[in-house]
Amino acid sequence: MKGGKRVQLTRPNRINSEIRAIKVRLTGVEGDQIGIVNLREALKKSEELGLDLVEISPNAEPPVCRIMDYGKFLYEKSKSSKEQKKKQKVIHIKEIKFRPGTDEGDYQVKLRNLIRFLEDGDKAKITLRFRGREMAHQKIGVDVLNRVKNDLIELATVEYFPSKIEGRQMIMILAPKKK
């Protein structure tokens, strides 16, 4: 390909002939300290063992290098990072919308959904929207939010409870209780 840019592979660690130091602090396969040796000598030792010389800490004086199987090292590193990602729980905020005049049947359905969200470990955002003349009856809206809060007292803790109306809505945020 004419005039194309070459893609250069960059490794997180320099290995074997990529190491630029004259002397290195060498550690063995099991992590035992060998000492400060000449780079050629360190490369020779790693070749004898059939392993790679990997620069672990390039900013140290002299740089710290370790004799190891670099492919295996990268595999173990990626495996451990995948394990850490698996253990992380992503918390989503699920939203349920109420109105001041939400009827009993609808209220129960929405409450059931809130319970499901909280049991799954997600946060819940309860939005209470006012329309038209409902703005004059904000107390009814606060009563609805208090009812939701009291119905979910065993499952959730209130992270945010509105002190006043924001625009045409009130928002309450619930977080699941720690088990």
Swiss-Prot record:
Protein localization: Cytoplasm
Matching InterPro entries: T_IF-3_C_sf (IPR036788), T_IF-3_N_sf (IPR036787), Translation_initiation_fac3_CS (IPR019813), Translation_initiation_fac_3 (IPR001288), Translation_initiation_fac_3_C (IPR019815), Translation_initiation_fac_3_N (IPR019814)
Keyword Cytoplasm carried by entry: yes
A single cellular component GO annotation: membrane
GO molecular function: ribosome binding; translation initiation factor activity
UniProt entry keywords in alphabetical sequence: Cytoplasm, Initiation factor, Protein biosynthesis
One Pfam family per UniProt: IF3_C
Major location category of this protein: cytoplasm
Cytoplasm is among the record's keywords: yes
GO biological process terms, semicolon-separated: ribosome disassembly
Subunit structure: Monomer.
Main function: IF-3 binds to the 30S ribosomal subunit and shifts the equilibrium between 70S ribosomes and their 50S and 30S subunits in favor of the free subunits, thus enhancing the availability of 30S subunits on which protein synthesis initiation begins.
Family of the protein in this entry: Belongs to the IF-3 family.
Protein name (database record): Translation initiation factor IF-3
